[in-house]
Every structure is written in C-alpha cells, then in structure tokens.
A protein has these predicted regions:
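Aromatic (often tryptophan-rich) hydrophobic motifs at membrane interfaces
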Residues: 101-208
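A conserved beta-strand-loop-helix scaffold within acyl/acetyltransferase catalytic domains
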Residues: 1-138, 154, 170
Length: 209
C-alpha cells in the first residue's frame, strides 16, 4: 500500500492493468497520518485514572514475550478459533535479525503481570501493528486503549508518518468486522486497501510483446 512508499510509485498498478491482471481480493486496513492526526472519539475519551494507575509500559523487554504470547494465543483461540501466524520463537528471531524493525511493547500491572501488549513492524516511515491483544484484566481496565494512545504519541514524537493498525476484514475482504474497524476509526484511523491480483503469465507475456 501507498503508506509504505517514500515517493509516488503506482507504476506497478498500471502495469497490472495493462497485462490484464484481475483484482482478486481487497482487504481493508486502518492507518493514522501521524503528522496530521484525526483524533477520534476513543482518543478524546478519558481513561479513568483509577483504571490506569499502576500500569507500566515496557519497551523491548523481550524476556516477557512468552507472557504476552500466551495472551495472543488465548485470545485468538477463544474469539476467532485460530492461531497466530508466527510462533513466539519466530518473532524473537525476527527481532534478533532486525532489531530496529521489530519492536515489542507490553503493559504490566501492579503485580508485574503482563496484561496486554503489541508486536510492531517498523519501516522508515510506517509503524505496522502485527499483533496486539489484551487479556481480561486489560479489557476491564481499558489498558489496551491506554497502550494505543501511548504508542501513537511515542511514534508521532519520533517523526514517523503513519501508524497502521492492520486489516479488519476476512475472507478476502468479503466480510468487514465493523466493530474492529470502528474501534480503529475512533483513534483516528482511516482506510487503506490491501489488494491481491490474479495474473495469467502467458497472457501477460503476450501483452508485453
């Protein structure tokens, strides 16, 4: 998507059109333009001080990854009957190889228990949320909202251009999780499409001759 471009570069889309590629699916993500954010209802809604008191934000505390990953696996299994694409070991390996581009943020409560967190993939101008889940206590205390606000402010201050939440669609874009999309919009996120094309290589070769 264009939010990962340093400069206008839609020549690939034009080429796909010229060689007869067919749009096969369109997923919808949400991103915030950090240089001119549209802070929505969830941004302006105050998080109760009592609920957020005692929360601690931890950055790149990788020894706590297994605790957060247990939350990720539990939420995905319970709510969506699925599993994360990566294992905790794979995420750690990605960080070891690309430490500046794979970041871990976790939130601990007063008992030093991890209750929510996020794994982010960071490019030169865009921060992408790869995994972000919250346990029961975090949902009760709205700790995930608190974390999102902290992350947006963190990367806005560092001059990043976009903060991307990830897709809110399933089945190749045919189903939109409206509640999830609404939540992202509440923080100022707006739509970014992820397109997939089907290309007949023989047809494309003939079109280029």
């Amino acid at each position: 998507p264009y939010i990962y471009h340093d400069y206008p570069s839609d020549e690939d889309l034009y080429w796909l059109f010229r060689v007869g590629a067919q749009l096969e699916s369109r997923a919808l993500s949400s991103a915030i333009l950090l240089q001119n954010p549209l802070h929505g209802d969830l941004w302006h809604r105050k998080i109760k001080r009592r609920a957020s008191e005692g929360l601690q934000l931890l950055e790149d505390n990788w020894e706590r990854l297994p605790e957060f990953w247990n939350i990720v696996c539990d939420v995905l299994e319970t709510r969506h009957q699925t599993k994360p694409v990566h294992s905790a070991e794979e995420i750690k390996l990605l960080h070891d190889r690309l430490p500046a581009h794979v970041k871990l943020f976790t939130v601990a409560n007063e008992r030093d228990e991890i209750i929510t967190g996020a794994v982010l993939f960071v490019t030169r101008q865009t921060v992408h949320v790869q995994y972000m889940e919250a346990g029961e206590e975090a949902r009760t205390r709205r700790a995930l909202d608190w974390l999102i606000q902290k992350l947006i402010a963190h990367y806005e201050q560092r001059g990043m251009r976009y903060f991307e939440f990830g897709i809110s669609t399933e089945r190749g874009g045919l189903y939109l999780n409206e509640g999830l999309a609404y939540q992202k919009e509440g923080f100022g996120g707006r739509g970014v499409c992820y397109d997939s094309y089907l290309l007949d290589l023989q047809q494309a070769t003939e079109a280029m001759e």
